[in-house]
Regions:
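Glycoside hydrolase catalytic-domain context in secreted enzymes
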Residues: 1-605, 609-626, 640-641
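Short beta-strand edge segments in extracellular beta-sheet folds
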Residues: 633-641
Length: 641
């Protein structure tokens, strides 16, 4: 009946337009209410539970993120969803955030690439993706009312680039703006952010949705650039009738909502749960990060192995209380593969409580075995999705048992289940540490495959693991005073902080060991000078020097060696490119990266522009942020791009 979006808008009454933009349907025109499905509600409804973002990020693989997004999109579509409220495109500012499970990484390059690929996957299934929450949402404490004070350079270099990449490359149907304030302005009333930057600079053409509870003044919210503002529709009607809100603004918002509704597939499509579950196991394998290995791993057939810790039987596989129907524990997987294991609970999964008899049984079993695997991690109550953590410690019952077992068993392995870094006081005393994060319902099979050498660990840390909480960038400012959170660390988040201060860490950003080895050779640039508007190509050849198939993550960092003064300080290095390559034993492959002046630039608050200082830059290629295999010199000769 109505051929275009404009014709539909013209057919709406003022009250219907206001209702559409605040959550109501328009039945007479066949327009449903806009509904956004949460990821965890999708899982709880019987869908496959895939790795959380914190685990998927460890894959360092945009293609894996795209495949996971596509599967989630198919499952959401099978339930009739219009929009899926993922991904979170914020950064991991520190280790205590209650949002850690759903946040990808501490670095904007990695976060942006994975979020964009994930969005492409979701939307390939006919379901819209929502990039959220714009912007600078790094905690749960006072999140809806907090004023984040962040300087301009830090915003432009750290917290906005991941969103820009997600918007430009992922083309989401919607962006969610957060509650709270940014530098004194309500985020959902920030015209500079929502209109000038999001729509103007980044070219976003979808719908901007206000987070529930974020709207204080619906008229000001829509005027700033929001299209969907859960509030009393009557207030919008009154604002238009009084002249406080131009009806053209309401028309724009209604148009964007209608486009979003029409873009969603109207026909539910059944999901292939069998294929999706196989994918969940595959992705969980890619999420495992081998942090330390002195030879206890991989375990070997015929070894008698003690499995200790309740997580071996009751795995911690996700946040948000999902109830996946096909979760397999590490014990189930070991039994299926006829491993010689002996299980002792040792400590409970849901609390910090030491049972002395159980403690001694675990120590005795470990001493009698050929190896001991301790399944440790944070109880679910310590990582609630709506609350920040208070410390970085594992339960004392776990730390004590790990230390005691390590004293009697040289082949002690610790498997960690957590959404982020924890302090590991026993790290130097155990043989091996495998971090599985929250790897979804495929966790049990994946852990079994990685422990016993049926798969090679290829995950890399998407965040730095510090030695202790006091070392972290925002230790003195997190979570704020209840009114304001000061981001005084500026651009020094994650590895940028530790590198600038030359601080030791437990495990660095990008770190991850393997059962095979990789040799880098022939690193070179195709030119030693980069010019404005030009490009330079970096090449390196990587060879699998071991006897097992593996996947290496080649990481490229840029270091500013110009010596030019930088207000706010110079970042020692920043990730600019990465590539994951699968290699058979003896196989080698050339990895190629193309760099532009933007990759060597920093943001100038004085000029309100990105600038590349003339001089020398270091192109650093390696296995992690602290395992650099080649450094190449690059000159740049122009000051502004």
């Amino acid at each position: 009946m109505y051929a275009t979006v404009q014709e539909l808008v013209d057919a709406l009454t003022l009250e219907e337009k206001a209702g559409l933009c605040t959550g109501a349907a328009v039945p007479r025109l066949g327009l449903p209410a806009l509904r956004v499905n949460g990821l965890h509600s999708q899982e709880s409804a019987g869908g496959v539970c895939f790795p959380s973002a914190c685990a998927a990020a460890a894959s360092f693989d945009p293609e894996a993120a795209r495949r996971m997004g596509a599967a989630l999109g198919r499952e959401a579509r099978s339930g009739g969803a219009q929009l899926l409220d993922v991904p979170d495109v914020n950064l991991k500012r520190g280790p205590l955030s209650g949002r850690s499970a759903d946040t990808w990484a501490e670095d904007p390059c990695l976060t942006g690439a994975l979020a964009a690929a994930f969005l492409q996957g979701v939307q390939s299934a006919g379901v819209g993706g929502c990039a959220g929450q714009l912007a600078v949402v790094n905690q749960e404490t006072d999140r809806r009312t907090l004023n984040r004070r962040v300087d301009e350079r830090t915003l432009q270099e750290l917290y906005l680039p991941a969103f820009e990449t997600a918007v430009r490359d992922g083309q989401p149907q919607a962006v969610v703006c957060s509650a709270g304030l940014l530098n004194g302005t309500r985020i959902c009333e920030d015209t500079a952010l929502l209109t000038d930057t999001l729509r103007g600079a980044w070219g976003f053409a979808g719908a901007v949705l206000a987070e529930p509870g974020a709207v204080q003044d619906p008229a000001r919210t829509l005027a700033a650039g929001v299209d969907f503002a859960p509030a009393d529709a009557g207030r919008l009607v009154d604002a238009v009738q009084s002249g406080a809100l131009d009806e053209s603004v309401l028309n724009r918002a209604a148009s964007n909502i209608i486009r979003t509704l029409l873009a969603a597939s109207t026909q539910p499509s059944p999901a292939d749960r069998t294929a999706d579950r196989s994918l969940a196991v595959e992705l969980a394998k890619q999420s495992g990060v081998l942090l330390r290995n002195l030879g206890a791993l991989p375990l070997h057939k015929g070894q008698k192995v003690a499995y200790i810790g309740a997580f071996a039987d009751h795995p911690r596989y996700s946040a948000g209380h999902p109830r996946a129907p096909q979760v397999t524990s590490a014990i189930d997987a070991a039994v299926l593969h006829d491993r010689k294991i002996h299980y002792i609970e040792g400590f409970p999964a849901d609390r910090d409580q030491r049972d002395e008899a159980e403690f001694l049984r675990a120590v005795a079993a470990a001493e009698a075995a050929d190896a001991a695997v301790i399944f440790a991690g944070l109880p679910e109550c310590a990582e609630l999705a709506a609350a920040d953590r208070r410390h970085m410690r594992l339960p004392e019952c776990q730390n004590n048992l790990i230390a005691r077992v390590a004293a009697v068993q040289k082949n002690t392995v610790v498997v960690l289940h957590t959404s982020g870094p924890v302090e590991c006081p026993w790290a130097d005393d155990v043989s091996s540490v495998l971090c599985m994060y929250l790897a979804g319902e495929g966790l049990g099979e994946a852990t079994d495959a990685l422990l016993w050498g049926d798969a090679d660990p290829c995950g890399r840390l998407p965040e730095t693991w510090p030695l202790r909480l006091e070392d972290t960038p925002c230790y003195l400012d997190f979570p704020g005073d209840g009114v304001t959170a000061d981001y005084r660390e500026g651009v020094y988040v994650g590895y940028r902080w530790y590198d600038a201060r030359k601080m030791p860490v437990r495990w660095p950003f990008g770190h991850g060991l393997s059962y095979t080895g990789y040799v880098y050779r022939g690193a070179a640039l195709d030119a030693d000078t980069l010019t404005p508007g030009g490009t330079v190509t970096a090449r390196v050849t990587v060879k699998n020097s071991g006897a097992m198939r593996g996947a290496e993550v080649v990481q490229l960092y840029v270091a500013d060696a110009t010596g030019a003064p930088v207000p706010g300080g110079r970042v020692p290095q920043a990730l600019r490119r990465f590539a994951k390559i699968d290699l058979q034993p003896g196989e080698e492959r050339e990895v190629v990266f193309t760099l532009t002046p933007q990759d060597i630039s920093r943001y100038s608050p004085e000029l309100h522009a990105w600038c590349a200082a003339p001089g020398r830059y270091g192109i650093r290629i390696g296995h992690s942020s602290r395992d650099i295999r080649a450094v190449l010199a690059l000159q740049y000769a122009d000051a502004k791009i």
